[in-house]
Amino acid sequence: MGEVKDWRPFVYGGVASITAEFGTFPIDTTKTRLQIQGQKIDQSFSQLRYRGMTDAFVKISREEGLRALYSGIWPAVLRQATYGTIKFGTYYTLKKLANERGLLINEDGSERVWSNILCAAAAGAISSAIANPTDVLKVRMQVHGKGQHKGLLGCFGEIYKYEGVRGLWRGVGPTAQRAVVIASVELPVYDFCKLQLMNAFGDHVGNHFISSFIASLGSAIASTPIDVIRTRLMNQRPVSITMNGVVTAAATPKLYSGSLDCAVQTIRNEGLPALYKGFIPTWVRMGPWNIIFFITYEQLKKY
């Protein structure tokens, strides 16, 4: 019977991820807008339009409509269908393999932290690299909002036309790094907290809620600087050039040459705190996202 259930962590992870994405996506949109603003070397996003998460939420809703908060939701759903399914399925599969080889459980019955971290890091890196194109589409659509893009297929066509297949893999390095950091912190911390709280709360919703909240704070602190770099790299595109009234595009963007260059220029031009732009919406979103995800996941496991 155990063999039959091997596919279930993958399906449960995907369904729970998509459910959580729908519930928290507007917060993610405000985070993306905050992270790309204030880039002094990019005139399109040099202005500080939003003072914070609440201001961004209000202005986007008022100026672009409530639907703009869900710009990019479909590539986000596609991302979770791949990223979420592969990440959580791979994580729990690797844990099972580690357990079978005696690498997971200590003599006192507790789980080994290093084993959990390695399983989570591997799962995060693999899944994020595979899902990177959907992440690029999501960021592009979030930045421009409703009415300024042609939808999922239109955005895909524009990237392919002007940037080629490589355009869909912009930011794959920091994306994988971010996924490794989040997975290495979030999943082991959740499992650790859940185990520690088992005597007080049992394997119930209260335990899942508290464990999710603690896990989200740690992952937000660790991952936000990488997330800022990732978002900026994904959003950069060929610079528009007008010649004889015809708009063309340069062969390559000249804003950032890579992750390190983006980090250096961001700190130099905007200061070190710029790497934590969007931290509040990141944490505010991670909390509910993890709570929705893990509660959904735990409930699905019962069937």
UniProtKB/Swiss-Prot annotation:
**Major subcellular location class:** mitochondrion
User: Which effects follow disruption of this gene?
Assistant: No visible phenotype. Reduced levels of total sugars (glucose and trehalose) in normal-fed flies and increased susceptibility to starvation. Life span is increased when fed a low-calorie diet and flies gain less weight when fed a high-calorie diet. Females lay a lower proportion of eggs, particularly under a restricted diet. Glycogen and triacylglyceride (TAG) levels are not affected in normal-fed flies. However, TAG levels decrease at a faster rate under starvation conditions. No increase in life span when fed a high-calorie diet or under starvation conditions.
Q: Does the keyword Mitochondrion apply?
A: yes
Protein name in UniProt? Mitochondrial uncoupling protein Bmcp
A single GO BP term for this record reads:
sensory perception of sound
Enumerate the InterPro entries for this protein.
Mit_carrier, Mito_Metabolite_Transporter, Mitochondrial_sb/sol_carrier, Mt_carrier_dom_sf
GO cellular component terms? mitochondrial inner membrane
